Amino acid sequence: QSDVKFVSNLQDLILLVQQMQRAVVKAPWSSSGRGVRYLTAQMLQDPGFSRWAERIIEKQGGVTVEPYYNKVKDFGMEFEAIDGQIVYRGLSLFQVAKNAYTGNVLASEEEKEEILQSYVSHEQLEAISQHVCEVMQPALKGVYSGPFGVDMMVCAKEPGSKDVFINPCIELNLRRTMGHVALA
């Protein structure tokens, strides 16, 4: 994502969040949303946030800062890296409450595409999955073999707007995800 920045000090982090006004700050290595903070520029005054950010920067070398998107719907795509090739396994539709995973939709691929069709076409989904395969194949070849998932999001351009876009990579999970389990 071109709008995601990696910063390695608290001063740069504060500056970026002030510029964005609303941002998502993520630890590079975390799970289940525990390394994620949703911020407004006003929340930067919280000493608890500063302590958290400094600790992550010290232990992990930095944090990522990205815009806070106007989420309409969460979804993902599941893949597997096998013998240097990337295989698309299917869609993952899941629910999130208070920014934490709560469960997956158990449905056929056709039913999941039907749920998403008011936001994204079959052709767009195919193009996104193909692009992930093309990008991840050289990135993972000889480095990682196994399942992985890419969390994605349908976003409104403005709060409450019907004008939407797809963010094709909110997060990359180099592991078996609950989306893989739902596909089984």
Locate each region found by the language model.
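Active-site-proximal flexible loops/turns
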Residues: 33, 158, 178, 182
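Active-site "cap" helix and flanking loop/linker of ATP-utilizing ligase/carboxylase catalytic domains
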Residues: 139, 175-184
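A long amphipathic alpha-helix within ATP-dependent nucleotide-binding catalytic cores
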Residues: 58-67, 88, 101-164
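Glycine-rich phosphate-binding loop of ATP-grasp-fold ATP-dependent ligases
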Residues: 2-7, 22-49, 76, 98-116
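Phosphate-binding site of ATP-dependent enzymes
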Residues: 20-21, 47-101, 153-169, 173-177
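Short acidic/polar capping segments at secondary-structure boundaries
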Residues: 10-12, 28-32, 69-71
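Phosphate-interacting basic helix/loop segments used at nucleotide- and nucleic-acid interfaces
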Residues: 3-14, 131-141
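Nucleic-acid 5′ end/cap handling module spanning
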Residues: 38-40, 164-169, 182
